[in-house]
Amino acid sequence: IVRNYDVDGIHLDDYFYPGTDFNDTETFARYGADFNSIDDWRRDNVNTLIASLDETLHTLDPELSFGVSPAGIWANKSENSRGSDTHGQSSYSELYCDSLEWIRRGTVDYICPQLYWAIGYKAADFETLVRWWQKAVSTSDVALYIGLGAYRSAEAQEGDVWYGTAELERQLALLDDSIDIQGEVYFSYASLERVAGCPAMLTA
């Protein structure tokens, strides 16, 4: 793509491992001797992929922007002291993505966590996660964009917190008052067109 098209960046979604049980024990036995566990080996595989892409892409185009949109919860505090005060699927332990390591190494230009939950949602509060990710990038040169779950508003029924534009407006107001956030990304733009009032909200 980079060799043949004048693109500004390359963006990856989050699913590097499937998040379900699968058998790679034979491969681990063959290649994982330097690791204490299969989990560490899997995370290193993903880290190696990200670092390799970063190096290759910037060799082809030093001005290109490379980033990833990981699942919104790196890890829950209950399983990892560096994690967020949440209770959801852990990218670190279930998808084997160590996005904090990518930030530490600088192997991404930006990170765009998928924060597809409402403000005040008990298991994964939007504001709690925004603040966690702000801290995660605070001592790095990695730009932070927040992924917003516009699809939830498109699918919501009357009475749901996501119905209409109110929740998205609350989230945008919170982000506007936050530092170290370069912008937001909607999943998906097509969803916005299905939410009454969204076009007017975005151009206001």
Predicted segments, located by residue:
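Polysaccharide-binding and catalytic clefts of secreted carbohydrate-active enzymes
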Residues: 1-107, 116-117
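Short, surface-exposed, charged/polar-biased interaction segments
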Residues: 22, 78, 123-124, 129-132, ...
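Short, glycine/charged-enriched secondary-structure capping and boundary segments
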Residues: 25-26, 81-83, 126-128, 199-201
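P-loop/Walker A phosphate-binding loop and immediately adjacent motor/lid segment at beta-alpha junctions
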Residues: 38-66, 71, 122-154, 204
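A conditional alpha-helix N-cap/helix-loop micro-motif detector
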Residues: 46, 92, 126, 164-165
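Substrate-binding cleft of secreted/luminal carbohydrate-active enzymes
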Residues: 96-122, 133-204
